[in-house]
């Protein structure tokens, strides 16, 4: 095939190119790369360029037919034949084909004259009519005018890119913003394209600020937009039959799905993608956000999505959206969010059944996970994209753990932010009071960010745009992944996190990947400083979250999806007998998952079921009892205002999830710690603690209480 090499078109740095062997392998993609508008430009391709190397552009027939010609009409108006999605002035394809076949044509710069008929036809319409009417020919038989007609339509769509900037239509599908992140460069794009067309799975890791979250998923969506449904990548383009090329593919609008652990990440990434594609707001864009109650939020709910959907979903909702997805991308896998691990398991197990093209895992670091990933995914492609901070980050190990003295020595300038990591919400609130009592100058603004804060995006937007204050942000590990605070120049990190373990939890040191993520909160927009008040040899090397989680949610989801409870797990518990113990417990409390799995799964998706015992009520109780339970679930987080009905007390007593108070101690601060043991415990640590203010103490030593909620933890007599 007569084509130019990509290396002859684009400037390729041989020293930094990660995949030199594949660049000229895909020369036909030279003008269909994702435009970063820094080195690859969203461009208008000229007739001259097409005529010089027509076969270089032939593959554009597929996305043009898919995105434009597939639902187009031929129109005749003012003696001009053209393509339009209008339903007026239509003319049949056979009529136009006969006009073209039986008359002499004069090919001019902008259109084609049909001699003797006083008619003109656009190159797009000429190409459409002559190609659709001769679908048995090979692509190699297309003439340069037909190929230019394809490109004229592609120019109209705005899906073409080039090594040089050219004019383009004002009404293109997208208006791409400039990005110089490493993942937008040609070698990485072509590697992602290769994975896409070969239907391979991959694990992607790399340095901070290379575009793991902001770019890589967008590349999979871009190639899905252009080529979803096309399967014939194993032969040369010129040998392909037109019929096979554009009529055999399945044009179902399969989505690209990016799965993230938290709603705040979904919102921030959603806004990022919307703006990067040139949209002012989410409605009318291809971006769809999925998390609980998103329909109530006008800024984040897309009631009019276009084209091939690009879905950003929290892991909890992803597990029900994997079907009809082309590329399933699970980000932040190093966090081992429970539903993230479940989503990985469903995608791998159902890949063939659901015709998933790619499963893509993204992580800051993979050292602790790579052995398991290689076992779980056979022949997975491993991609590492090296990157340094866009700006230098100075790392300091500080023996003085006093945050006040550190701030005095390293306080950022006005308009900048400092992020201080602590392990618990309680610790954050304590230090907020301390800082507010010491930093009394009005120049300082102090914020807390954690999972209980509902308006995180609004807080971040406010402090990023406020140039008149110094912003001090106290955060749990909530801020360590993906969320970028553009004016952050300083991070102070005690290296600790609170790890939930069944009904209790403990403070522990963070992992290597978490350290990298926290350090990476600075150095993206400007130079920064990372101060740690711990030694790096205290970092955790391995930690299995599943060893400290109840397994009933895994079992319920796996049962519904006909998956093996143990072998299909992405991360397996060290003690496999826990699975059998959980299954036996379900039987003992009259939860027949074999008989009622559809009902149970629907309730599991509709309500925040934080205790497996609730499922027994949905199966065995009356409608009025179920209504009481649902009202309780909706109000549990405002339990101090909730009036507990007597009938609901009876229901929970019957569930019989009991615990005994085994110890009561008073802290130095005057609070009361009560220790409990779960009676008839079937899994995990049976011991847990609750703290009360002395005036609000409600428990008595050796008394039995009933657990009615595990998250938040709530007991009744």
UniProtKB/Swiss-Prot annotation:
Subcellular location: Virion
Catalytic reaction(s) noted: ATP + H2O = ADP + phosphate + H(+)
Keywords: ATP-binding, Helicase, Hydrolase, Nucleotide-binding, Transcription, Virion
Domain Helicase ATP-binding: 193-384
UniProt-recorded Gene Ontology molecular function terms: ATP binding; ATP hydrolysis activity; RNA binding; RNA helicase activity
Chief location category: virion
Residue ranges of the motif DEXH box: 331-334
SUPFAM superfamilies: P-loop containing nucleoside triphosphate hydrolases (SSF52540)
Transcription listed as a keyword: yes
PANTHER family (UniProt xref): ATP-DEPENDENT RNA HELICASE, ATP-DEPENDENT RNA HELICASE DHX37-RELATED
Family, as annotated: Belongs to the DEAD box helicase family. DEAH subfamily.
Protein known as: RNA helicase NPH-II
UniProt source species: Melanoplus sanguinipes entomopoxvirus (MsEPV)
């Amino acid at each position: 095939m007569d084509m130019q090499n990509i290396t002859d078109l684009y400037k390729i740095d041989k020293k930094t190119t990660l995949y030199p062997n594949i660049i000229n392998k895909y020369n036909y993609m030279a003008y269909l790369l994702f435009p970063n508008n820094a080195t690859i430009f969203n461009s208008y391709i000229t007739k001259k360029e097409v005529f010089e190397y027509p076969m270089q552009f032939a593959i554009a027939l597929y996305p043009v037919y898919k995105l434009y010609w597939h639902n187009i009409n031929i129109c005749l108006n003012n003696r001009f034949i053209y393509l339009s999605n209008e339903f007026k002035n239509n003319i049949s394809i056979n009529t136009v084909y006969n006009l073209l076949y039986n008359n002499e044509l004069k090919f001019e710069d902008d259109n084609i004259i049909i001699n003797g008929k006083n008619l003109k036809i656009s190159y797009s319409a000429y190409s459409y009519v002559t190609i659709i009417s001769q679908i048995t020919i090979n692509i190699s038989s297309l003439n340069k005018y037909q190929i230019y007609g394809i490109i004229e339509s592609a120019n109209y769509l705005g899906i073409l890119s080039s090594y040089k900037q050219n004019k383009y239509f004002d009404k293109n599908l997208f208006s791409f913003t400039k990005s110089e992140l490493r993942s937008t460069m040609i070698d990485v794009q072509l590697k992602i394209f290769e994975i896409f067309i070969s239907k391979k799975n991959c694990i992607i890791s790399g340095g901070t600020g290379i575009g793991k979250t902001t770019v890589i998923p967008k590349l999979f969506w871009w190639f899905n937009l252009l080529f979803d449904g096309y399967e014939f990548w194993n032969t040369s383009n010129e040998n392909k039959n037109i019929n096979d090329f554009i009529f055999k593919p399945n044009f179902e609008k399969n989505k690209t799905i990016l799965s993230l652990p938290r709603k705040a990440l979904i919102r921030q990434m959603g806004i990022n993608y919307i703006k990067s594609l040139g949209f002012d707001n989410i409605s009318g864009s291809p971006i769809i956000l999925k998390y609980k109650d998103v329909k109530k939020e006008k800024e984040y709910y897309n009631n009019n999505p276009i084209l091939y959907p690009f879905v950003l979903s929290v892991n909890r909702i992803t597990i029900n959206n994997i079907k009809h997805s082309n590329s399933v991308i699970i980000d932040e896998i190093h966090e081992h969010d429970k539903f993230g691990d479940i989503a990985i398991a469903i995608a791998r197990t159902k890949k063939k059944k659901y015709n998933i093209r790619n499963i893509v895992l993204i992580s800051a670091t993979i050292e602790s996970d790579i052995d398991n990933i290689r076992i779980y995914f056979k022949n997975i492609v491993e991609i590492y994209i090296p990157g340094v901070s866009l700006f230098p980050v100075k790392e300091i190990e500080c023996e003085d753990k006093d945050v006040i003295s550190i701030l005095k020595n390293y306080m950022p300038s006005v308009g900048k932010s400092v992020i201080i990591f602590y392990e618990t919400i309680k610790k954050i609130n304590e230090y907020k009071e301390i800082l507010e009592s010491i930093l009394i100058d009005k120049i300082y603004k102090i914020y807390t960010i954690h999972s209980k804060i509902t308006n995180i995006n609004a807080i971040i937007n406010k402090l990023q745009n406020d140039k008149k204050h110094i912003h001090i942000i106290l955060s749990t590990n909530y801020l360590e992944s993906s969320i970028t605070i553009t004016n952050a120049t300083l991070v102070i990190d005690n290296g600790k996190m609170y790890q939930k373990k069944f009904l209790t939890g403990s403070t522990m040191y963070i992992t290597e990947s978490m350290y990298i993520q926290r350090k990476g909160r600075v150095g993206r927009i400007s130079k920064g400083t990372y101060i740690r008040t711990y030694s790096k040899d205290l970092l955790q090397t391995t930690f299995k979250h599943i060893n400290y989680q109840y397994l009933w949610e895994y079992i319920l989801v796996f049962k519904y999806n006909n998956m093996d409870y143990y072998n299909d797990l992405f991360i397996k518990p060290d003690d496999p007998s826990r699975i059998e113990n959980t299954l036996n417990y379900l039987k003992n409390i009259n939860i027949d998952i074999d008989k009622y799995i559809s009902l149970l799964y629907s309730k599991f998706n509709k309500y925040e079921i934080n205790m497996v015992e609730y499922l027994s009520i949905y199966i065995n109780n009356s409608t009025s009892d179920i209504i009481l339970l649902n009202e309780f679930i909706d109000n549990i987080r405002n339990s101090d205002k909730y009036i507990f009905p007597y009938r609901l007390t009876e229901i929970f007593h019957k569930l019989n999830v009991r615990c005994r108070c085994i110890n009561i101690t008073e802290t130095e601060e005057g609070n009361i710690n009560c220790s409990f043991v779960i009676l008839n415990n079937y899994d995990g640590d049976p011991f847990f603690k609750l703290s009360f203010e002395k005036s609000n103490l409600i428990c008595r030593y050796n008394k039995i209480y009933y657990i009615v909620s595990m998250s938040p933890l709530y007991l009744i007599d």
